């Protein structure tokens, strides 16, 4: 599969927390202690059969990133 997304990070799923409609998926990136947390639909988790310990690639759309500071 080829994608236009430039921000691609390989890692391992460390947590899947499924709610009623949405789910939180945490992926520890390879080569460090950084964890990316993503909110996805429950259906996406079930369709992709996401499980802890499974390798995954995180794709981040640059125009959709929000950064905040205090």
Identify the meaning behind each predicted range.
Residues 1-70:
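Non-catalytic connector elements of ABC transporters
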